[in-house]
Amino acid sequence: MTHTIAAPTSSNSAQAAQYEALLTAFYQAFAQGDGEAMAACYAPDARFSDPVFTDLYGQAVGDMWRMLTSRAQDFKLEFSGIRADEHTGEAHWIATYTFSQTGRTVVNRIHSRFVFADGKIAQQQDMFDFWRWTQQALGLTGYLLGWSNMVQGKIRAQAAKGLQQYQRQQGR
């Protein structure tokens, strides 16, 4: 079950600065394709959700980033708007890459919200326009059917299967 994470409030505390630095390090690692460094930013029992990976927990969160960064083609990341308070954070980012299954270029604009605990990311909720993503990744099929539960469900199932295969290959 996905819970909406509130936006951070204004804060000048040392804890808020630490969490802003954590998010900056997270996105710098992402831009460099370093899934291992990204995974290290999460608490062991972290939760992640987005329109594709709707509810990941613990090791699966880090494994998702390891998988995605290891398979990325023509990947470019821009990030901005990093803000944090003592408990929550947010960032905006744009991922540009080639979707391997179709060879089509995707420019995905994402807004992320975070909850922190003990110096790590405890929860992350990424929001983006799934239909827009399907249009870019799948072309005409995405434009005509990408809004439907059927197509979105197939994409989610395929992503979950890919993550499970990756985890098996890694011995997890």
For each of these PLM feature ranges, what is it?
Residues 1-40, 44, 160-172:
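Short, low-complexity N-terminal intrinsically disordered segments enriched in polar/charged residues
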Residues 2-7, 69-78, 83-172:
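A beta-strand edge to alpha-helix "cap/lid" segment located at domain peripheries
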Residues 23-26, 30, 42, 61, ...:
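Hydrophobic alpha-helical core bundles mediating ligand binding, dimerization, or RNAP-core interactions
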Residues 35-39, 43-89:
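A solvent-exposed, acidic/Ser-Thr-rich amphipathic alpha-helical stretch
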Residues 15-25, 49-51, 68-71, 155-159:
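Short, mixed-charge, low-aromatic patches
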Residues 26, 38-39, 46, 61, ...:
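Hydrophobic pocket/interface hotspot
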Residues 18, 60, 106:
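Soluble or luminal CAZymes and related metallo-dependent hydrolases
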Residues 12-15, 54, 103:
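Alpha-helix initiation/capping motif
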